Amino acid sequence: MMQLLEVPEWKWDSISMEFVMGLPNTLRGHDSIRVIVYRLTKSAHFIPINISFPVSKLADIYTSVIVKLHGVPLCIVSDRDPRFTSYFWKRLQEALGSKLRLSSAYHPQTNGQNERTIQSLEDLLRACVLEQRGSWDTYLPLIEFTYNNSYHSSIGMEPFEVLYGRRCRTPLCWHESGESVVLGPELVRETTEKVKLIREKMKSSQSRHKSYHDKRWKDLEF
């Protein structure tokens, strides 16, 4: 029987963590991505790491990125990766007051809708990463920006809008909103093109994921 998690009451109450591994090594020494998704708002952080980092270093990154920006979550949902089941990680979360919820290999549905969100993110990240190879980690901030400012059907708006009550205002999106702006600097033009590319990858990934989901659903209907 599917085990569903309770719906969070506040934006930063509950997060889901997972690793996207097996990526090409970058010049900065990264070969994996730590994906952290806020379950209520669907907003996400994509953090480049090396999978050989010790748990203590991963904990430092967690504190400097997540806790610094959003405070301590009440609940952390993850799979049973050894890093999430380690004594150090458990004691740290116990000290911070966060409850750990580990999904079972036999009941991955514990993650519910978030499991599908993570899968879509993995498809998007891998599509962008494989194209950029040795420099994919330099694209992660733009991938994160694009994801958090793209429409999500499950919440009916962009994650950024859920978090802050308004759509993100940025020169990168002015060309879509009809505002007149001169994109002068080469950096802005280049960044705009990168965002367009990432959005195309995201749409393609979502389309493939939907087709796969629809096919599985149709196969079950008989």
Residue ranges and their predicted role:
Residues 1-222:
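Integrase module of LTR retroelements
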